[in-house]
């Protein structure tokens, strides 16, 4: 019997367009490889609690948002997850959704549930009845086009661009006979007959699919998920455009493109799949409703996080370190990155006169930077912010200018040689003829025990120079935000961080997220120069910040892969500080050795700290460092309340003294910038662990770079976003425990609430428990827990213990 087409509803273009816009904003952005940063994969779901997000992502992605039940059951059996934790999680859940007893929750943890299943697309239904993988075929054809369209210089033949993504795809698809060869007769003609505008094409496809306006948003979200990283890359373009007050349609164009594929497949397979497709449409229309299992999973996840918070309470309840009143011999400011914590702990253990502090690694300088001998502008600041000043490393002296020209010529020659190596007519011949020439270099690179040392760029400078008033305002704002207003040591290091790895497409993800995926050396050197400026220092005295004449600021770079620290003391030569610098280098070397020994215990095949540097140069090493795996806490408090405590490299540490923050402007900055950045990092690790197929980048061993923008697994397919599996798993067990971040701030909880009320999007992270929030008392103890909707409750604390506990 011939099935009739689904009824064609009357559609409102504005309503459908708005549904596409909402679906687009439910997708997280994906930054290109050159500046990749961690992104919260649940960015579009932070306005709803975990159970509701579970229902949504099950429908559109077939993805879990929590671990398998066995994971929780194992922790209950081991005692790690106690009855106290389970009871507290039950009490915190909405009354209508929680089990009645702890025993019921434990029984539920023993029952494994079916994996989530997404609603089907037409391509999936066509695959099921035809025996041909239309789902994979559509993904492959769109990927083949997208890799050329979004290319950033890797492709040797440029793809047609067109005025927008839809127009460019349409131009390509009308000449692509591959679908016809594989049986989709008339595809090119269908595309040619489609409207020229993406909006009109989308309406046409939706009508042909028989979708209602009510079904559109979920269906559009489903289509974007089916495109993997390509949809996220398009979302990145919209993100960047909106930062500059513009817009971009690539992500909604992708919805139209993917819908055209489905409508064409429905025309071919409608007699076989009409009933199933009608059922799917009805599923897309249904209001989202979490299941009982969704609520139980959310409660179990909350319980595990409460268990971790209980351990952290014990660590912080240990007696605080006394705050020395004498002048320190050395102060060193680090990025808040969790990898800084072990190094800071090791460095402070060497001498009581050493003080460290934590601050966002861009050090309050929102710069667009041009490196020496380069015209490429790098946004070295959090991706949440637009650059406000420009800087460069060229033009200091005639010698620098000559060197700049020479390096530019060398760089152009290197690029030309590289393109020749990749060219279709020469690539194989190149390997045959030139391979032996590279033997010595390959052996040298592979056998070198340490990291490659490169000559530093000249000291960066503001370009154009900032007026004195702007320099003073910037210096004051940064020092107050760092809670660094005195006393000052004779030597103050400002240390950014970066990573030294080879053969790693995701190398920028190991650099500083607060610097937009670049190393933090430029920002550190800029701030050191600003604070060494005599005019700035004189003006700061009038603002109650007196920097002693014998204090020298020096920029530095902490290599998180090797724990070596580079000092840029040549930027500001000071013979008077030669002895202090020599002593500091000794301290840094010793602290680096201690930190490497600690890290070696966690890294596979790194029996000693000495193996760490060799790993950085190993082409085959998929785990040169663990990066931010294990991150679980963000603490903003005076350093004495965290110093001496073993936080296992799992806490972001931000120095903050609310008593100096009279208007709570620094508290506002912390809650709206570094806390949000840390949440993106934490939730990227969380998503890549609980649902690696959806939110992870797959297997590093299979990665190939495409378009200079991202990676695919193998020879093609969808762009992969998120973290590779090797970043969260050591081959035998998880090294990242998927826990939502606990944010601890030493400040009056009333002040925290006032700021959250001004920023609904930040408050939503806490109201919906994507983050946990605690206010610390004046002794650094977890005193208040935020319970949502502006409410707080007293947090139970263990008795004060003189012994310093471990976070493990």
From Swiss-Prot:
The keyword Nucleus does not apply. One of its GO terms (molecular function) is zinc ion binding. Its cofactor is Zn(2+). One of its GO terms (cellular component) is plasma membrane. It comes from the Bacteria. Zn(2+) binds at residues 335, 337, 497, 512. It is found in: Cell inner membrane. It is a peripheral membrane protein. Pfam families: DabA. The keyword Cell inner membrane applies. Keywords: Cell inner membrane, Cell membrane, Membrane, Metal-binding, Transport, Zinc. Part of an energy-coupled inorganic carbon pump. Belongs to the inorganic carbon transporter (TC 9.A.2) DabA family. Forms a complex with DabB. This is Probable inorganic carbon transporter subunit DabA. It comes from Rhodopseudomonas palustris (strain ATCC BAA-98 / CGA009).
């Amino acid at each position: 019997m011939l099935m009739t087409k689904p009824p064609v509803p009357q559609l409102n273009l504005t309503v459908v367009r708005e549904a596409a816009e909402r679906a687009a904003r439910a997708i997280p952005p994906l930054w290109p490889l050159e500046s990749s940063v961690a992104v919260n994969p649940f960015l579009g779901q932070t306005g709803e609690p975990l159970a509701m997000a579970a229902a949504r992502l099950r429908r559109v992605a077939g993805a879990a948002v929590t671990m398998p039940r066995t994971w929780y059951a194992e922790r209950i059996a081991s005692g790690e997850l106690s009855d106290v934790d389970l009871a507290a999680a039950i009490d915190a859940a909405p009354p209508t959704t929680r089990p009645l007893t702890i025993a019921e929750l434990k029984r539920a943890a023993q029952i494994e549930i079916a994996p989530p299943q997404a609603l089907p697309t037409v391509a999936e239904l066509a695959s099921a009845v035809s025996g041909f993988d239309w789902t994979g075929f559509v993904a492959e054809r769109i990927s083949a086009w997208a890799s050329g369209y979004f290319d950033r210089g890797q492709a040797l033949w440029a793809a047609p661009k067109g005025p927008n993504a839809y127009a460019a795809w349409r131009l390509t698809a009308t000449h692509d006979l591959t679908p016809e060869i594989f049986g989709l007769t008339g595809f090119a003609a269908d595309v040619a007959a489609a409207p020229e505008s993406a909006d009109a094409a989308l309406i046409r496809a939706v009508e042909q699919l028989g979708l209602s306006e009510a079904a559109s948003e979920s269906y559009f979200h489903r289509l974007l998920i089916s495109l993997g990283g390509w949809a996220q890359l398009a979302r990145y373009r919209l993100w960047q455009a909106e930062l500059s007050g513009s817009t971009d349609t690539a992500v909604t164009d992708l919805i139209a493109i993917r819908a055209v594929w489905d409508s064409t497949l429905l025309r071919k397979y409608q007699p076989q799949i009409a009933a199933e497709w009608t059922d799917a449409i009805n599923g897309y229309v249904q209001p989202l409703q979490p299941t009982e299992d969704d609520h139980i999973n959310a409660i179990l996840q909350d319980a595990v996080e409460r268990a971790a918070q209980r351990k952290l309470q014990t660590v912080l309840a240990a007696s605080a370190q006394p705050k020395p009143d004498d002048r320190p011999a050395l102060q060193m400011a680090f990025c808040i990155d969790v990898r800084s914590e072990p190094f800071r702990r090791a460095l402070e253990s060497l001498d009581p006169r050493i003080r460290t502090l934590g601050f966002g690694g861009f050090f309050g300088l929102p710069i667009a930077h041009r490196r020496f001998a380069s015209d490429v502008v790098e946004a070295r600041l959090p991706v949440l912010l637009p650059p406000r000043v420009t800087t460069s490393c060229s033009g200091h002296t005639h010698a620098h200018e000559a060197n700049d020209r020479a390096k530019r010529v060398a760089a152009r020659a290197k690029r030309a040689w590289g393109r020749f190596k990749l060219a279709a007519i020469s690539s194989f011949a190149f390997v045959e003829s030139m391979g032996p020439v590279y033997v010595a270099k390959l052996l040298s690179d592979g056998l070198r025990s340490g990291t490659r040392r490169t000559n530093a760029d000249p000291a960066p400078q503001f370009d154009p120079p900032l007026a004195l008033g702007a320099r003073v305002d910037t210096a004051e704002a940064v020092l107050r935000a760092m809670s660094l207003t005195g006393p000052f040591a004779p030597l103050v290091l400002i240390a950014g961080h970066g990573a030294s790895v080879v053969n790693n497409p995701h190398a920028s993800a190991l650099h500083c997220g607060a610097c937009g995926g670049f190393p933090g050396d430029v920002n550190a050197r800029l701030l050191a120069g600003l604070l060494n400026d005599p005019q700035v220092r004189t003006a700061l005295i009038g603002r109650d910040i007196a920097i002693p004449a014998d204090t020298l600021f020096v920029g530095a770079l902490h290599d998180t892969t090797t724990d070596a620290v580079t000092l840029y003391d040549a930027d500001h030569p000071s013979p008077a500080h030669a002895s202090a610098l020599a002593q500091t280098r000794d301290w840094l070397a010793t602290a680096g050795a201690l930190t490497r020994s600690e890290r070696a215990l966690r890294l596979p095949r790194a029996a000693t700290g000495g193996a760490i540097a060799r790993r950085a140069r190993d082409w085959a090493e998929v785990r040169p460092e663990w990066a931010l795996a294990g991150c679980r806490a963000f603490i903003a408090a005076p350093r004495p309340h965290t110093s001496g405590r073993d936080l296992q490299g799992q806490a972001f540490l931000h120095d903050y003294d609310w008593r100096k923050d009279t208007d709570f402007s620094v508290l506002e900055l912390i809650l709206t910038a570094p806390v949000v950045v840390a949440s993106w990092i934490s939730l990227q690790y969380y998503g890549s662990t609980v649902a690696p197929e959806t939110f992870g980048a797959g297997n590093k061993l299979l990665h190939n770079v495409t378009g200079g923008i991202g990676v695919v697994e193998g020879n093609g397919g969808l762009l992969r976003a998120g973290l590779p599996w090797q970043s969260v798993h050591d081959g035998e067990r998880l090294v990242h425990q998927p826990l939502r971040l606990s944010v601890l701030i030493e400040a009056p909880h009333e002040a925290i609430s006032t700021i959250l009320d001004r920023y609904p999007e930040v408050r939503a992270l806490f109201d919906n428990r994507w983050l946990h929030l605690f206010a610390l008392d004046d002794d650094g103890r977890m005193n208040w827990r935020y319970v949502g909707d502006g409410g707080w409750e007293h947090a139970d604390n263990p008795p004060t213990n003189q012994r310093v506990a471990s976070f493990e």
